[in-house]
Amino acid sequence: MALQTYGGFTAQANSMTGVEFSKLYNPLHLKRVTQMMMFDKYALAQFIPANSGVKTMFCFRYRSLKPATTPLTEGVLPTETAIVREKVDYTVAQYGSFIKYSDQLDTFDVDNMKAQFTDILGDQAALTGDVVIRDVISAGTRVIYAGSATSRATVISGTKLIEVGDLKLAALNLKNARAEKFKAINSGSTKIGSTPIRSAYVGIVHPNVVEDLRNLTGWKNIEDYAYTSDIMENEVGSWGDIRFVENTNAKVDTAGAKPVYITLVMGKDAYASVSVRGKNGTEMIFKPLNSGGVENALNQVGSVGWKMYCGAKILNELFMVRIESVATLDVGDLIRYADNTGTVSDATTIE
């Protein structure tokens, strides 16, 4: 079957129309694979004011003081107390993407592709923000190598799975750092409002690692909870003070002989998501066929795109720890329609 390219994509084609006439078209759009967006739900939302002239802001954190347990002596002034103030910078960058389409495609194609482009690009924008946050917080300084391994390399060489001892160590690290447990999570893409949950630390885990968690002593599936009214989206179960939500977008390092999975366990205010005040959403941009100057002299090209401001920052390293492990069932993404790596009969790339 001949393929013909138009603008930003390749359509399944016959002649000059980009439409195959030998079969009846069904306007039903089959569901495509999308990622679960999660990392901004547990972030402290921060905003840089628009028109402020800066892309970077900073805030201060004052360290707590030790108890003053020495009794005062009459008439003697004690030594003054030193205070330590830490500065934390956070910044944003701009991200965006677009798809072009031709006038012939707009005229002859039977599908409402512009509506589909908008939907697909919206998913891409959300995934972009999720990955930006994920990559920042997955690079923190607090790390537990599964099964008493001493490095990522020994996690791989020893085929170290996540263990009860790793979860105990993660929870104790957060408790001893006096990290606050989550009692509510952000709700909605604008991060305005929150949903109450049962007090706990939160672990974000890849589905492959979830299967190893289910084998651990003390693991509790969500169907075994005494109360199910406050189950978080994509929550799969809990162990001790940690409630786990699974996410196919969890960080996986594939540089070694085996994939290493990053399970993040965190308390409240461990990290921030950063945007620009008044521009914290995604701006969808539509350029119709009659837009542009001499570069589009014959009104042959239009486009649909998005752009947004996004950033992330670890606010307190002590409030977050990552567990690095391999997985027993190392099931890869065999077909990923979302990132165009799958091979499907009659599939075409739109260029």
What are these regions (language model features)?
Residues 58-60, 100, 202-204:
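Structural recognition of the beta-strand scaffold that forms the well-ordered cores
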Residues 105-187, 334, 343, 349-350:
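Alpha-helical scaffold segments that mediate packing/assembly in large oligomeric complexes
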